[in-house]
A protein has these predicted regions:
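Transmembrane alpha-helices and adjacent helix-loop boundaries
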Residues: 1-250
């Protein structure tokens, strides 16, 4: 194997990417694990915000709808890098000011928690619109039938609306998940050790920029391909019992 790598000039790259020192492969995998942790947390937080935000926009009062409209408009209008800087530093300062007002010392916020908080707020705005559109796509007769049976709003949401809207929401949510995995790279600007920052540090230390950034791109691509398979399975599961597009045309 070593001779084959030497033949193609890949021996040095393989050594740099090895999992044990002096290779940096272990650092890249740790960065990938941190990126996935933040992406999963932010995606989950965004789903919760989005679900309640969508219901608030559709069924809430005028004040609530206006506040949610401001939230989704501002988040979608401002570049995500600027939002990350604002939410990270302003949020940290606010928490420390509140803590000091109660007589506590400076609070050290975990990088993972801060990353989930920042990206979760961003994800929530987009998820609100995705889920709002999915809820509006549910045939009104299904929700009216649930109400006629005396189901309370929460039970109607849990047993009728959410299952019915899943087939409409899954493609948009899949895109949001992929955006979340890529947006973790923006956290490198605040010094969080995710995949992009680990890649930059490895490349700067070895001057092998092409090798490490190509490896990072391959890891991001692997996450995307695996995610596409998983969300494809979820979409097929959500559409079970429904006619396919070809059957509808016939």
């Amino acid at each position: 194997v070593t001779g084959l790598l030497d033949l193609f000039g890949l021996a040095e790259s393989a050594q740099l990417l090895s999992l044990s020192p002096p290779g940096w492969g272990g650092n890249l995998l740790r960065g990938l694990a941190n990126s996935l942790q933040i992406a999963l947390g932010a995606f989950g937080m965004g789903l919760i915000i989005g679900l309640f935000g969508a219901y608030g926009k559709l069924y809430g009062g005028p004040i609530l709808r206006d506040l949610l409209a401001i939230y989704t408009t501002v988040i979608r209008a401002v570049p995500e890098l600027v939002l990350i800087l604002i939410l990270y530093y302003v949020g940290t300062d606010l928490i420390n000011k509140v803590a000091s007002s109660f007589g506590y010392g400076r609070v050290e916020i975990s990088g993972i928690v801060a990353g989930i908080w920042v990206l979760g707020i961003v994800q929530g705005a987009y998820a609100t619109e995705v889920l709002r559109g999915a809820i509006k796509a549910v045939p009104p007769g299904q929700i009216e039938a649930a109400r006629s049976y005396g189901m309370p709003p929460f039970m109607t949401m849990r047993r009728v609306t959410i299952p019915a809207m899943m087939s409409f929401a899954t493609p948009g949510l899949a895109n949001l998940w992929l955006i979340a995995t890529k947006d973790t790279a923006l956290l490198a600007i605040v010094g969080f050790a995710e995949l992009t920052l680990e890649t930059r540090q490895a490349a700067s230390s070895t001057r092998a920029y092409f090798t490490f950034f190509l490896a990072a791109g391959a890891l991001y691509l692997m996450v995307t391909l695996c995610s596409s398979v998983i969300f494809g399975w979820i979409e097929r599961w959500a559409r079970r019992g429904q006619p396919s597009l070809r059957e509808r045309r016939q």
